[in-house]
Amino acid sequence: MSNHRVLKLREAMQQKNVEALFVTSAINRRYLSGFTGSSGYVLVTLNDAYLLTDFRYMTQAPQQAKDFKVVEHAQRVTDTVKELLASANINKLAFEQDDVSFASYSAYAEQLKPIQLVPVSGLVEQLRIIKDAEELKVMQRAADLADSTFNHILGFVKSGMTEREVDLEMEFYMRRHGATCSSFDTIVASGERSAMPHGVASERVIAGNELITFDFGALLDGYCSDLTRTIAIGEPDPKLKEIYNIVLEAQLHALEHIKPGMTGREADALARDIIAKYGYGDMFGHSTGHGLGMEVHENPRLSKLSDDILQPGMVVTVEPGIYIPGLGGVRIEDDIVITETGNAVLTHSSKEFTVLPV
């Protein structure tokens, strides 16, 4: 696994005239090496691949990063990096500009002299966009866990509970069934708070005759799922039923037509144009979707301005919504993988308008 990814990374490095890359991002480190420890760095040259870590992980690291030379780094990791580069006669080092703070860059530049630091962006992230078969298996399991969590919470949630109580039950259920944790701060937004696209769970007490939006996911074996469903407890305002049906129509239309070769803006328009047709375009203020993988928000983007080209193996969300301040909102989201001819849906929770008893 790791070796194949390193070979692809080297191809990308050669295209950018990069002889050595210093990987500081924890996500990219795990993607390349498989190492899950909390501290470490990856150094990749055109001939060698090193995992640099400290004493605490010198047993774990060789077990996980089997295709890497594991090195216990000096108190200052830059001393070890400098030594390894000198032995390979390399005097330029690329670093991840999107991960390294200015303070860290300043320290690296001083400590690594006379090695020249070169900022690069997206070398590893571009590899992560296309998922291989093993990654897709893990992501399907993460999606399955999100589905089972939603099914569980339908039998748990009741009026009189706080949103936070529901959030904690969802977190406990996902962890009990194999998740490391939730893949992001769970959104449980009830009543008028459902008009907040990112209304994370609060101490609000769930009442009757209102909507609840659940937006959540599981982080499982390093990969995220991301599922949104909106339900009712008791009969809500008829206007909310109306916008539910519009959002569902938009989402189903997008799922039916998203395919490889399409741009992110074209995919976005599939859902957005339907919502606009019904007069709610101004109440759908976020993108239709985003890439999903080791992070919950990755490329490609399904938005009004996105020129990203959808390709087989990409995993994206499809999540249109309508939000009416003071009344409530609806969002419906699934995870899909782009296939050779269209897409396959990974999440399968019911999208029928569900009304639970008060």
Predicted segments, located by residue:
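Active-site neighborhoods and metal-handling regions in enzymes and metal-associated proteins
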Residues: 1-358
